[in-house]
Amino acid sequence: EATFNLSQPADEIDIFLSHSWRDSGLLKYLALCLYFNSVMAMVAALISGFLAFLLLRSGKITLLPFAPFMNVFNDFNEAMHAAGFRPSYDLNQFPWMDPAYKPIYAPSCQLVATSAFVIVLLLGHHLRAPVTMFLDKVCIHQTDPQRKAAGIQAIDQFLVRSKKMLICYNDDYFERLWCCFELAARASSGSEIEMLPLWRAPVVLVVLVGFTVSHIAEYVYLLFAGVGGSPNGFTIVSITFHAIPTLFMIEYTVLATRQKLKLTDTLRTFKITNTKCFDPSDRSIVEQAISSWFAGGGEPVSEPEGSSGLRGRAGVDTRAIERFEGDVRGGMTHRMIVSSVGKQPGLLRVRDLLLIFYTVWIPCSLDFSVRGVGRGNEMVVTFMIFVCPIAQGLSFLIVAWVASVS
Protein backbone atom coordinates (compact mmCIF):
# COMPACT_ATOMS: atom_id res chain seq x y z
CA GLU A 1 0.00 0.00 0.00
CA ALA A 2 2.83 2.40 0.87
CA THR A 3 4.49 1.80 -2.50
CA PHE A 4 1.24 2.35 -4.41
CA ASN A 5 0.69 5.62 -2.52
CA LEU A 6 3.86 6.98 -4.13
CA SER A 7 1.99 7.17 -7.45
CA GLN A 8 -0.29 10.04 -8.39
CA PRO A 9 -3.01 10.63 -11.02
CA ALA A 10 -1.90 12.07 -14.37
CA ASP A 11 -3.67 12.88 -17.64
CA GLU A 12 -0.50 12.33 -19.67
CA ILE A 13 2.68 10.32 -19.10
CA ASP A 14 6.10 11.14 -20.55
CA ILE A 15 7.72 7.72 -20.19
CA PHE A 16 6.36 4.18 -19.83
CA LEU A 17 9.21 2.12 -18.38
CA SER A 18 9.24 -1.56 -19.33
CA HIS A 19 11.73 -3.74 -17.45
CA SER A 20 12.33 -7.15 -15.94
CA TRP A 21 12.20 -7.34 -12.17
CA ARG A 22 15.05 -9.87 -12.26
CA ASP A 23 17.54 -7.35 -13.67
CA SER A 24 19.78 -5.28 -11.41
CA GLY A 25 18.20 -2.10 -10.09
CA LEU A 26 21.60 -0.38 -10.29
CA LEU A 27 21.93 -1.18 -14.01
CA LYS A 28 18.44 0.21 -14.63
CA TYR A 29 19.26 3.37 -12.69
CA LEU A 30 22.47 3.90 -14.69
CA ALA A 31 20.63 3.27 -17.97
CA LEU A 32 18.08 5.97 -17.11
CA CYS A 33 20.83 8.34 -15.97
CA LEU A 34 22.62 7.94 -19.30
CA TYR A 35 19.35 8.43 -21.20
CA PHE A 36 18.26 11.58 -19.37
CA ASN A 37 21.53 13.17 -18.21
CA SER A 38 24.32 12.31 -20.69
CA VAL A 39 24.14 15.49 -22.79
CA MET A 40 23.88 17.66 -19.68
CA ALA A 41 26.84 15.80 -18.17
CA MET A 42 29.02 16.34 -21.25
CA VAL A 43 28.17 20.07 -21.34
CA ALA A 44 28.95 20.36 -17.62
CA ALA A 45 32.26 18.55 -18.14
CA LEU A 46 33.36 20.83 -20.97
CA ILE A 47 32.28 24.03 -19.20
CA SER A 48 34.00 23.04 -15.94
CA GLY A 49 37.11 22.01 -17.90
CA PHE A 50 37.28 25.40 -19.64
CA LEU A 51 36.66 27.28 -16.37
CA ALA A 52 39.42 25.31 -14.67
CA PHE A 53 41.72 26.11 -17.60
CA LEU A 54 41.02 29.86 -17.35
CA LEU A 55 41.59 29.91 -13.59
CA LEU A 56 44.76 27.83 -13.85
CA ARG A 57 46.03 29.90 -16.75
CA SER A 58 45.49 33.12 -14.79
CA GLY A 59 47.43 31.70 -11.85
CA LYS A 60 44.56 32.22 -9.41
CA ILE A 61 44.41 28.54 -8.46
CA THR A 62 46.73 25.54 -8.53
CA LEU A 63 45.30 22.04 -8.34
CA LEU A 64 48.19 19.70 -9.18
CA PRO A 65 51.96 20.26 -9.37
CA PHE A 66 53.33 20.34 -12.90
CA ALA A 67 55.47 17.53 -14.28
CA PRO A 68 57.95 17.76 -17.19
CA PHE A 69 56.60 16.43 -20.46
CA MET A 70 58.38 15.30 -23.61
CA ASN A 71 59.08 17.70 -26.47
CA VAL A 72 56.90 15.58 -28.75
CA PHE A 73 57.63 17.24 -32.07
CA ASN A 74 61.38 17.52 -31.54
CA ASP A 75 61.49 13.82 -30.57
CA PHE A 76 59.50 13.01 -33.71
CA ASN A 77 61.92 15.03 -35.84
CA GLU A 78 64.91 13.22 -34.36
CA ALA A 79 63.21 9.86 -34.94
CA MET A 80 62.65 10.76 -38.62
CA HIS A 81 66.32 11.61 -39.06
CA ALA A 82 67.38 8.43 -37.26
CA ALA A 83 65.18 6.41 -39.64
CA GLY A 84 66.84 8.04 -42.65
CA PHE A 85 64.05 10.46 -43.61
CA ARG A 86 65.29 13.89 -44.67
CA PRO A 87 62.40 16.34 -45.23
CA SER A 88 63.04 19.07 -47.81
CA TYR A 89 62.34 21.77 -45.21
CA ASP A 90 63.98 22.34 -41.85
CA LEU A 91 61.52 21.50 -39.09
CA ASN A 92 63.70 23.33 -36.58
CA GLN A 93 62.65 26.65 -38.11
CA PHE A 94 59.28 26.32 -36.37
CA PRO A 95 59.06 27.62 -32.77
CA TRP A 96 57.60 24.37 -31.45
CA MET A 97 60.61 22.45 -32.78
CA ASP A 98 63.03 24.17 -30.37
CA PRO A 99 65.13 21.27 -28.98
CA ALA A 100 65.64 23.21 -25.74
CA TYR A 101 61.92 23.63 -25.15
CA LYS A 102 60.67 21.86 -21.99
CA PRO A 103 56.86 21.62 -21.81
CA ILE A 104 55.15 20.95 -18.49
CA TYR A 105 51.83 19.23 -17.83
CA ALA A 106 49.27 18.36 -15.13
CA PRO A 107 45.87 16.70 -15.80
CA SER A 108 43.95 19.26 -13.71
CA CYS A 109 41.36 20.25 -16.33
CA GLN A 110 40.66 16.63 -17.21
CA LEU A 111 40.27 15.64 -13.57
CA VAL A 112 37.79 18.49 -12.99
CA ALA A 113 35.87 17.71 -16.20
CA THR A 114 35.61 13.97 -15.51
CA SER A 115 34.45 14.60 -11.93
CA ALA A 116 31.79 17.01 -13.19
CA PHE A 117 30.65 14.49 -15.80
CA VAL A 118 30.20 11.67 -13.29
CA ILE A 119 28.39 13.87 -10.74
CA VAL A 120 25.98 15.38 -13.28
CA LEU A 121 25.40 12.02 -14.98
CA LEU A 122 24.33 10.40 -11.71
CA LEU A 123 22.47 13.36 -10.17
CA GLY A 124 21.62 15.68 -13.06
CA HIS A 125 17.93 14.67 -13.13
CA HIS A 126 17.46 16.67 -9.92
CA LEU A 127 18.33 19.81 -11.90
CA ARG A 128 15.93 19.33 -14.82
CA ALA A 129 12.18 19.65 -15.20
CA PRO A 130 10.24 16.72 -13.67
CA VAL A 131 9.36 13.81 -15.95
CA THR A 132 6.26 11.69 -15.37
CA MET A 133 6.95 7.96 -15.62
CA PHE A 134 4.87 4.80 -15.35
CA LEU A 135 6.59 2.16 -13.20
CA ASP A 136 4.55 -0.99 -12.72
CA LYS A 137 5.66 -1.68 -9.15
CA VAL A 138 4.40 1.75 -8.06
CA CYS A 139 1.47 2.39 -10.39
CA ILE A 140 -0.21 -1.05 -10.14
CA HIS A 141 -1.39 -2.22 -6.74
CA GLN A 142 0.66 -5.26 -5.69
CA THR A 143 -1.37 -6.60 -2.73
CA ASP A 144 -5.07 -6.12 -3.57
CA PRO A 145 -5.98 -8.77 -6.23
CA GLN A 146 -8.94 -6.81 -7.65
CA ARG A 147 -7.06 -3.52 -7.96
CA LYS A 148 -4.08 -5.38 -9.40
CA ALA A 149 -6.26 -7.03 -12.07
CA ALA A 150 -7.86 -3.67 -12.93
CA GLY A 151 -4.42 -2.07 -13.30
CA ILE A 152 -3.19 -4.90 -15.50
CA GLN A 153 -6.24 -4.67 -17.76
CA ALA A 154 -5.67 -0.90 -18.13
CA ILE A 155 -2.01 -1.16 -19.18
CA ASP A 156 -2.89 -0.33 -22.79
CA GLN A 157 -4.59 2.87 -21.61
CA PHE A 158 -1.48 3.88 -19.70
CA LEU A 159 0.51 3.38 -22.89
CA VAL A 160 -1.99 5.31 -25.01
CA ARG A 161 -1.36 8.26 -22.70
CA SER A 162 2.43 7.78 -22.76
CA LYS A 163 4.64 9.65 -25.22
CA LYS A 164 7.31 6.95 -25.32
CA MET A 165 8.00 3.41 -24.09
CA LEU A 166 11.53 2.82 -22.77
CA ILE A 167 12.66 -0.80 -22.65
CA CYS A 168 15.43 -1.64 -20.16
CA TYR A 169 16.76 -4.39 -22.38
CA ASN A 170 18.72 -7.46 -21.37
CA ASP A 171 19.03 -10.83 -23.10
CA ASP A 172 16.10 -12.35 -21.24
CA TYR A 173 13.64 -9.48 -21.84
CA PHE A 174 11.55 -11.38 -24.41
CA GLU A 175 11.58 -14.45 -22.17
CA ARG A 176 9.68 -12.65 -19.39
CA LEU A 177 5.88 -12.90 -19.62
CA TRP A 178 5.23 -9.51 -18.03
CA CYS A 179 7.65 -7.76 -20.38
CA CYS A 180 5.86 -9.31 -23.36
CA PHE A 181 2.56 -8.25 -21.82
CA GLU A 182 3.70 -4.60 -21.76
CA LEU A 183 5.01 -4.96 -25.30
CA ALA A 184 1.61 -6.27 -26.39
CA ALA A 185 -0.05 -3.27 -24.78
CA ARG A 186 2.31 -1.00 -26.72
CA ALA A 187 1.50 -2.81 -29.95
CA SER A 188 -2.20 -2.23 -29.40
CA SER A 189 -1.71 1.46 -28.55
CA GLY A 190 0.97 2.50 -31.07
CA SER A 191 3.38 4.18 -28.62
CA GLU A 192 6.98 4.91 -29.66
CA ILE A 193 9.66 2.43 -28.52
CA GLU A 194 13.27 3.04 -27.49
CA MET A 195 15.68 0.34 -26.29
CA LEU A 196 18.04 0.97 -23.36
CA PRO A 197 20.60 -1.88 -23.19
CA LEU A 198 21.50 -2.22 -19.52
CA TRP A 199 25.26 -2.61 -20.02
CA ARG A 200 25.67 0.54 -22.14
CA ALA A 201 25.87 3.02 -19.23
CA PRO A 202 28.46 1.06 -17.17
CA VAL A 203 30.65 0.75 -20.26
CA VAL A 204 30.52 4.50 -20.97
CA LEU A 205 31.41 5.23 -17.34
CA VAL A 206 34.20 2.65 -17.09
CA VAL A 207 35.80 3.66 -20.40
CA LEU A 208 35.56 7.41 -19.75
CA VAL A 209 36.89 7.18 -16.19
CA GLY A 210 39.44 4.57 -17.32
CA PHE A 211 41.02 6.90 -19.88
CA THR A 212 41.18 9.67 -17.28
CA VAL A 213 42.90 7.30 -14.83
CA SER A 214 45.32 6.36 -17.64
CA HIS A 215 46.34 9.99 -18.10
CA ILE A 216 46.72 10.41 -14.34
CA ALA A 217 48.99 7.32 -14.27
CA GLU A 218 51.13 8.86 -17.04
CA TYR A 219 51.29 12.09 -15.05
CA VAL A 220 52.34 10.30 -11.85
CA TYR A 221 55.13 8.55 -13.74
CA LEU A 222 56.38 11.85 -15.19
CA LEU A 223 56.08 13.54 -11.80
CA PHE A 224 58.30 11.01 -10.03
CA ALA A 225 60.53 9.75 -12.86
CA GLY A 226 60.69 12.91 -14.96
CA VAL A 227 61.77 13.06 -18.57
CA GLY A 228 65.13 11.72 -17.47
CA GLY A 229 63.58 8.43 -16.36
CA SER A 230 63.57 5.21 -18.34
CA PRO A 231 63.08 5.98 -22.06
CA ASN A 232 60.54 3.20 -22.32
CA GLY A 233 58.93 3.72 -18.94
CA PHE A 234 56.36 6.27 -20.08
CA THR A 235 55.39 4.11 -23.06
CA ILE A 236 54.94 1.04 -20.85
CA VAL A 237 52.80 2.94 -18.33
CA SER A 238 50.73 4.56 -21.08
CA ILE A 239 50.04 1.36 -23.01
CA THR A 240 49.31 -0.67 -19.86
CA PHE A 241 46.74 1.73 -18.43
CA HIS A 242 45.15 2.61 -21.78
CA ALA A 243 44.77 -1.08 -22.61
CA ILE A 244 42.26 -1.64 -19.78
CA PRO A 245 39.46 0.71 -20.96
CA THR A 246 40.26 -0.05 -24.60
CA LEU A 247 39.93 -3.81 -24.15
CA PHE A 248 36.82 -3.29 -22.03
CA MET A 249 35.21 -1.29 -24.84
CA ILE A 250 36.21 -3.91 -27.44
CA GLU A 251 34.82 -6.70 -25.26
CA TYR A 252 31.53 -4.85 -24.85
CA THR A 253 31.32 -4.20 -28.59
CA VAL A 254 31.63 -7.95 -29.19
CA LEU A 255 29.07 -8.63 -26.44
CA ALA A 256 26.69 -6.03 -27.88
CA THR A 257 26.98 -7.52 -31.36
CA ARG A 258 26.13 -10.97 -29.99
CA GLN A 259 23.26 -9.43 -28.04
CA LYS A 260 21.89 -7.89 -31.22
CA LEU A 261 22.15 -11.21 -33.08
CA LYS A 262 20.34 -12.94 -30.22
CA LEU A 263 17.65 -10.24 -30.27
CA THR A 264 17.12 -10.80 -34.00
CA ASP A 265 16.84 -14.57 -33.49
CA THR A 266 14.51 -14.14 -30.49
CA LEU A 267 12.16 -11.89 -32.47
CA ARG A 268 12.14 -14.31 -35.40
CA THR A 269 11.11 -17.29 -33.23
CA PHE A 270 9.02 -15.48 -30.61
CA LYS A 271 6.16 -17.41 -28.95
CA ILE A 272 4.26 -16.40 -25.83
CA THR A 273 4.29 -20.01 -24.57
CA ASN A 274 8.10 -19.85 -24.28
CA THR A 275 8.00 -16.98 -21.79
CA LYS A 276 8.56 -17.40 -18.05
CA CYS A 277 6.59 -16.04 -15.12
CA PHE A 278 7.41 -16.05 -11.41
CA ASP A 279 3.76 -16.61 -10.39
CA PRO A 280 2.05 -19.17 -12.71
CA SER A 281 -1.37 -17.78 -11.80
CA ASP A 282 -0.47 -14.52 -13.58
CA ARG A 283 -0.24 -16.23 -16.98
CA SER A 284 -4.00 -16.54 -17.51
CA ILE A 285 -4.53 -12.86 -16.55
CA VAL A 286 -1.85 -11.72 -18.99
CA GLU A 287 -2.96 -13.92 -21.89
CA GLN A 288 -6.61 -12.91 -21.46
CA ALA A 289 -5.60 -9.24 -21.58
CA ILE A 290 -3.52 -9.80 -24.75
CA SER A 291 -6.47 -11.69 -26.26
CA SER A 292 -8.77 -8.72 -25.70
CA TRP A 293 -6.29 -6.29 -27.25
CA PHE A 294 -5.65 -8.35 -30.39
CA ALA A 295 -9.18 -9.60 -30.98
CA GLY A 296 -10.74 -8.27 -34.20
CA GLY A 297 -11.86 -4.67 -33.70
CA GLY A 298 -11.19 -4.95 -30.00
CA GLU A 299 -13.87 -7.65 -29.68
CA PRO A 300 -13.30 -11.40 -29.29
CA VAL A 301 -12.94 -13.21 -32.58
CA SER A 302 -16.19 -14.97 -33.52
CA GLU A 303 -15.88 -18.73 -33.46
CA PRO A 304 -17.47 -20.83 -36.23
CA GLU A 305 -20.14 -23.23 -35.02
CA GLY A 306 -18.65 -26.52 -33.89
CA SER A 307 -15.08 -25.20 -34.03
CA SER A 308 -12.58 -26.09 -31.35
CA GLY A 309 -9.15 -24.80 -30.52
CA LEU A 310 -9.92 -21.12 -31.04
CA ARG A 311 -10.11 -20.80 -27.28
CA GLY A 312 -7.23 -22.03 -25.19
CA ARG A 313 -6.79 -22.28 -21.45
CA ALA A 314 -9.01 -20.05 -19.29
CA GLY A 315 -10.85 -18.72 -22.32
CA VAL A 316 -7.73 -17.34 -24.02
CA ASP A 317 -8.26 -16.50 -27.70
CA THR A 318 -5.40 -18.36 -29.40
CA ARG A 319 -5.92 -16.52 -32.69
CA ALA A 320 -5.46 -13.19 -30.92
CA ILE A 321 -2.31 -14.53 -29.24
CA GLU A 322 -1.01 -15.61 -32.65
CA ARG A 323 -1.69 -12.11 -34.02
CA PHE A 324 0.48 -10.65 -31.27
CA GLU A 325 3.24 -13.21 -31.89
CA GLY A 326 3.13 -12.43 -35.60
CA ASP A 327 3.37 -8.71 -34.84
CA VAL A 328 6.54 -9.30 -32.81
CA ARG A 329 8.04 -11.65 -35.43
CA GLY A 330 7.44 -9.43 -38.45
CA GLY A 331 4.80 -6.76 -37.90
CA MET A 332 4.81 -3.15 -36.72
CA THR A 333 6.23 -4.03 -33.29
CA HIS A 334 9.11 -5.92 -34.92
CA ARG A 335 9.90 -2.95 -37.18
CA MET A 336 9.82 -0.48 -34.27
CA ILE A 337 12.20 -2.62 -32.19
CA VAL A 338 14.64 -3.05 -35.08
CA SER A 339 14.43 0.67 -35.86
CA SER A 340 15.17 1.52 -32.22
CA VAL A 341 18.25 -0.72 -32.17
CA GLY A 342 19.43 0.75 -35.47
CA LYS A 343 22.10 -0.45 -37.88
CA GLN A 344 25.08 0.55 -35.77
CA PRO A 345 27.43 -2.24 -34.61
CA GLY A 346 25.73 -4.21 -31.88
CA LEU A 347 23.86 -2.07 -29.38
CA LEU A 348 26.68 0.48 -29.00
CA ARG A 349 25.85 3.94 -30.36
CA VAL A 350 28.19 6.35 -32.16
CA ARG A 351 26.83 8.98 -29.78
CA ASP A 352 28.38 7.13 -26.81
CA LEU A 353 31.79 6.99 -28.50
CA LEU A 354 31.65 10.73 -29.21
CA LEU A 355 30.61 11.34 -25.61
CA ILE A 356 33.74 9.56 -24.41
CA PHE A 357 36.08 11.21 -26.91
CA TYR A 358 34.98 14.79 -26.32
CA THR A 359 34.66 14.54 -22.54
CA VAL A 360 38.14 13.01 -22.20
CA TRP A 361 40.24 14.60 -24.92
CA ILE A 362 39.17 18.26 -25.01
CA PRO A 363 39.95 18.87 -21.31
CA CYS A 364 43.15 16.86 -21.81
CA SER A 365 44.20 19.22 -24.60
CA LEU A 366 43.57 22.23 -22.37
CA ASP A 367 45.96 20.84 -19.76
CA PHE A 368 48.84 21.25 -22.21
CA SER A 369 48.14 24.98 -22.59
CA VAL A 370 47.83 26.00 -18.94
CA ARG A 371 51.47 27.13 -18.83
CA GLY A 372 51.92 27.72 -22.57
CA VAL A 373 53.54 30.93 -23.83
CA GLY A 374 51.42 31.18 -26.97
CA ARG A 375 54.19 30.17 -29.36
CA GLY A 376 55.52 26.86 -28.15
CA ASN A 377 54.84 23.18 -28.05
CA GLU A 378 51.67 23.40 -25.94
CA MET A 379 49.64 25.32 -28.48
CA VAL A 380 50.43 22.84 -31.24
CA VAL A 381 49.74 19.86 -28.98
CA THR A 382 46.49 21.52 -27.93
CA PHE A 383 45.48 22.02 -31.55
CA MET A 384 46.25 18.44 -32.55
CA ILE A 385 44.58 16.85 -29.52
CA PHE A 386 41.55 19.06 -30.11
CA VAL A 387 41.32 18.30 -33.84
CA CYS A 388 41.96 14.54 -33.69
CA PRO A 389 38.75 13.70 -31.76
CA ILE A 390 36.77 15.87 -34.17
CA ALA A 391 38.22 13.97 -37.13
CA GLN A 392 37.59 10.65 -35.39
CA GLY A 393 34.04 11.70 -34.51
CA LEU A 394 33.29 12.71 -38.09
CA SER A 395 34.65 9.40 -39.36
CA PHE A 396 32.36 7.49 -36.95
CA LEU A 397 29.37 9.54 -38.13
CA ILE A 398 30.24 8.88 -41.79
CA VAL A 399 30.55 5.14 -41.15
CA ALA A 400 27.23 5.11 -39.29
CA TRP A 401 25.53 7.05 -42.10
CA VAL A 402 26.91 4.68 -44.77
CA ALA A 403 25.71 1.69 -42.72
CA SER A 404 22.25 3.20 -42.32
CA VAL A 405 21.72 3.73 -46.05
CA SER A 406 23.35 0.51 -47.25
Where are these regions (language model features)?
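The feature represents the membrane-entry module of six-transmembrane cation channels
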Residues: 1-406
